[in-house]
Amino acid sequence: MATKKKALKKSKLRHAEYYDFQKIQDKLYAESMDGKMFTKLVEIITLPENIKLAYRNIKKNKGSKTAGTDGKTIQHLEKLSEEKLVVLVQRKFSWYVPQSVRRVEIPKDNGKTRPLGIPTIMDRLVQQCVLQVLEPICEAKFHDHSYGFRPNRSQQHAISQVHKNMQLSHLHYVVDIDIKGFFDNVSHGKLLKQLWTLGICDKKLISIISAMLKAEVAGIGFPEKGTPQGGIISPLLSNIVLNELDWWLASQWENIPTQYPFKQTPNRNGSPNHGNKYASLRRSGLKEITCVRYADDFKIFTSSYPNAVKLFHATKDWLKERLGLDISCLLYTSPSPRD
């Protein structure tokens, strides 16, 4: 499975290079790192090369053969020439009104079901066009402790970081938090504000994303909250919502200024190495904490049981006050049964 995912990521990169869109994505990432406020993103989203790239990526996805409420699949788009497809998608963006979403129930291991919302193939293509432009902008603002549904990150990377936290940093106390019905309870208004905070200030694009969120679910109606699982853009939107949590948790220890001097050295890949800073922070006597998040599943690591309890209550209150989300269950993990 991991090999297939790596191959898919490599194929997407090759597609971007083939359509000469990788340079645009790199530019968006660099500008986002510099704090640019993007006001004309729809112009980039509707570029022919972005639309062609989106179609190529959609076509390679096995879900492209799954029909939405209109009964159409990728085979219906294959009949169109590239020129006609580009014009069709550009017209769609000029006044975007999504079609209804087909709802299906997917069985889970515990005997329950997980609802999926399947947009029409054309709406999936529109979402892919948006994703390819938003993703590099958001990647520049996402925290390193987030691993789910991100380029060049995987479950294996998250597991490796968990082992590092417990074995090398000796943070044996873990607060394992499960958000109650996360995908069904995301506030649309809060999410749109978070997009703006990340520098996505194109009002037309914000309106389009709002329309995606409020698309009618066949047989149920128009949702007032939530990001339906099954949509191509939903994983990115969920990371945008919880990115605020990542940075808040980081502010509780690792981003605190330290009075002890330290030398900043880069890793081999050029990314910053925080080891010296963390060593300096440990000298300060502050209670060390860190976290690992994969989508809506996140674990907070610390060095003592009392601190774990404090972190749980602080995180629970923060999620409720800032994001309007509740916790459904909690598990404390300690190094021995006595603890």
Regions found by a protein language model. Give the residues of each.
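Active/ligand-binding-proximal structured segments within catalytic/core domains
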Residues: V126-L134, L237-V241
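Non-catalytic, polymerase-adjacent accessory regions of viral genome-replication enzymes
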Residues: M1-E83
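Conserved small/polar residues in nucleotide/adenosyl-binding loops
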Residues: Y332-D339
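Amphipathic alpha-helical blocks
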Residues: H76-P98
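Short alpha-helical scaffolding segments that buttress acidic/His motifs in well-ordered protein cores
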Residues: A54-Y55, C129, I208-L213
